[in-house]
Amino acid sequence: QPLAAETHDSQPAAIRLVTEARGDDGSVGCAAGGLPGDMHKLWRPATRGSYHMEYGNSTMGDEIAGGIGVAMAEPERRVHVMVGDGSYLMLANEIMTARQEGVGLTIVLLDHHGYRCIRNLSDACGAVNPFNDFRARDPETGTFTGEVLPIDFAANAASLGAEVFTAGTPAELETALRDARAVTGRPAVIVVETNPEPGVPAYDAWWDVPVAEVSVSERVQAARAEYEENLKKERSFV
């Protein structure tokens, strides 16, 4: 069972659509996973103070709470929060806080069906960790390779007081962003069914992430050999 259809929206496309929907007075907030790296490359701030990013410590769950703070500090702006499903599950209850405080903001929840960023990093290091996908445990193999978990993010967000929209294609997301902007006095959540495969090309710089020196896995051994070759090219400018 595939995690998503190829026709579903992608994270880069979603960033583009949120940028276009933001307008001249909007701002965006984000915190963890692959989103900050993609937004660093793709987001185009319209005005000063319209880009709020926590990335140094990758604080999963900070997105919605931080967005509420921005919206309370600058009520004249329409705040957009972009968050993956993994981070959303860490602190989704802050939607209730936004409802309690009467804060209007748009939360764009990208449903990747798992922790995509750490899965990609794990794959690059030679590891195979199916527990990064939101799948059920297969009783025959004992691994998380069973059916995709039927997590109903739309129902969850609605139960916490949000007005909810859903989208699975770029056209649907464009419409949902427009409708969400009209919601005031309460949070609006757009649940976007996302194809996690399309990504944004990396920079030419190399990221020094050590790989295990000792492993029985041929994939890890190959990743370690590649790491050691790249390490020889590393230069310190400090």
Can you describe what each PLM-predicted range is?
Residues 38, 42-238:
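Thiamine diphosphate
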